[in-house]
C-alpha cells in the first residue's frame, strides 16, 4: 500500500513502496496471433479462396448492404461478435482488392 498523503490513518496510510510489477501470466496470450499461424492461414486462404457464403457476403458488401450482410453472416457463423469480425475481414479484403485494382490502372 503506497503512501499517497502524509497521513498515519485512512486508506492511504503506510510506508512508501515501489509497486512490484509482475509479468503477465502465460494463459493471457491465448488467442494472440503468432507469425506461424498467420502464415498458415494466409496460405490456406490463397489455396482455398473463399467459401460460398463468404462470396455472397462480399457481393452484399459491394452493393453497400452492410446490415443485410451482417444478418446473413450471423446466420452462417452463429454469433453476433463472430459475424461482425467476419464482415470486417471481408470488407478489408474488398478494400484491398479495390486498392490493388486502382494501383494496376
UniProtKB/Swiss-Prot annotation:
GO terms for molecular function: structural constituent of ribosome. One of its GO terms (biological process) is cytoplasmic translation. It is found in: Cytoplasm, Cytosol; Cytoplasm. The keyword Cytoplasm applies. Its main location: cytoplasm. Gene3D superfamilies: 60S ribosomal protein L36. It comes from the Eukaryota. The modification N6-acetyllysine is found at residue 62. Pfam families: Ribosomal_L36e (PF01158). InterPro entries: Ribosomal_eL36 (IPR000509), Ribosomal_eL36_sf (IPR038097). The keyword Isomerase does not apply. One of its GO terms (cellular component) is cytosolic ribosome. Keywords: Acetylation, Cytoplasm, Ribonucleoprotein, Ribosomal protein. Belongs to the eukaryotic ribosomal protein eL36 family. Component of the large ribosomal subunit. The ribosome is a large ribonucleoprotein complex responsible for the synthesis of proteins in the cell. PANTHER family: 60S RIBOSOMAL PROTEIN L36. Component of the large ribosomal subunit. This is Large ribosomal subunit protein eL36.
Amino acid at each position: 500500500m503506497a503512501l499517497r498523503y502524509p497521513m498515519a490513518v485512512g486508506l492511504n496510510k503506510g510506508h512508501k513502496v515501489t509497486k512490484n510489477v509482475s509479468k503477465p501470466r502465460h494463459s493471457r496470450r491465448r488467442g494472440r496471433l503468432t507469425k506461424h499461424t498467420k502464415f498458415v492461414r494466409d496460405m490456406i486462404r490463397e489455396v482455398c479462396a473463399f467459401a460460398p457464403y463468404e462470396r455472397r457476403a462480399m457481393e452484399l458488401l459491394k452493393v453497400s448492404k452492410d446490415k443485410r450482410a451482417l444478418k446473413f453472416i450471423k446466420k452462417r457463423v452463429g454469433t453476433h461478435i463472430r459475424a461482425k469480425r467476419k464482415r470486417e475481414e471481408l470488407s478489408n479484403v474488398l478494400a484491398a482488392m479495390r486498392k490493388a485494382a486502382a494501383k494496376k490502372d
